[in-house]
Amino acid sequence: MRFQAGLTYFLKKLYPDTFQIPDMQYRSNMLQERGAYRFAAFTRLFFWTEPGYETGVMPDGMIYYGDAQWYVNKKKAYSFAAKGGHNDEPHNHNDLGSFIIATDAGQCLADIGSGEYTRDYFREKRYTYLCNASAGHSVPLIDGQEQLAGRERAAKVLEHGEHVFEISFEKGYGIEALTALRRRFELAEDSVSMRDSYQFDDGNTHQITERFIALIEPQETAAGVLVGDVLLVCKEKPAVNKIIIKDHNAEDLAVYQIDYAAGTEFEIQFQIRG
């Protein structure tokens, strides 16, 4: 993921004491990297870029954006981001509870991003595109069902702090028997631990698939599944599936779904090995 220089310099003007401009090697080249060319983005680049500013490194630390329910935490070894929110956002993805873990190797637990813009992409078939559907995010499938779209499909943040982020997001699923679904992240300097807890009120056994998305090819080892610099350690046996989709530039993109069959309590640790 590269930054847009024009918008970045504009933010530097607004927040001169706290906002850092990344090194120019990470700058986006709009003409080479973007499949949808926008006049507004070009004008921002042309009028707002002021190369006189010094580049720097964002300090380590946690930021929580309450209105959007976005949690971002930068450590020395990795960066972590997770979201609550709702499933009726602009350019919406059905992604309550999804998260990213990034290292110098890139996004190890990844967000696919936007797909190829077609007519159906913005119509009723929007959520048949993997990048927009919850099946293309690091969130569970319950009885084979994905999250649904809509403003009522919303999460609730239960706790956020320097080392923890916890949400409930059972409303994301149209499953009447699902009365509670909590996802809790605990962050250390070299690992992220995640625990999901489910409650159902019908007394039945439900099929739960915990899914994690990668764009780096996973390697199955004796210790766990290695994705870039991140080792997924879980007592359950993984199943890895590769799917080819069209990315925003209409080019083939390999997406890896790492699935675990789970019960009503599920724990996994993401160990940073870089």
What are these regions, as identified by a protein language model?
Residues 1-108:
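Carbohydrate-active enzyme catalytic cores, enriched for enzymes
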